């Protein structure tokens, strides 16, 4: 999920922190719709347009999970769709 606000179609205003927050809001909505929660997430992949944004993204990321963190990969990419700063994908599994 990119940090795009579905009500406006625009990126969350600010920087990577705001886009990361919006990305998690989007993921929570999708997971909830499917009957999952963030506690069901077993793997994440974080794509960053600039690896210097890792610490800011990670602060938000850490606040989204309770207990053990899911497995994670974080990679720098040349560009993201619509010139986003961060994109996060998750895999969730019901136990």
Which residues are covered by each model-predicted region?
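Short, polar/acidic, helix-capping and beta-turn segments at strand->helix junctions
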Residues: 1-95
């Amino acid at each position: 999920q990119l940090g795009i606000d579905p009500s406006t179609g625009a990126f969350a205003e600010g920087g990577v922190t705001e886009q990361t927050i919006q990305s998690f809001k989007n993921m929570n909505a999708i997971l909830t719709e499917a009957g999952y929660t963030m506690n069901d997430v077993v793997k994440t992949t974080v794509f960053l347009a600039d690896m210097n944004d890792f610490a800011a993204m990670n602060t938000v990321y850490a606040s989204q999970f309770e207990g053990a963190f899911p497995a994670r990969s974080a990679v720098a990419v040349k560009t993201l769709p619509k010139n986003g700063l961060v994109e996060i994908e998750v895999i969730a599994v019901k136990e």
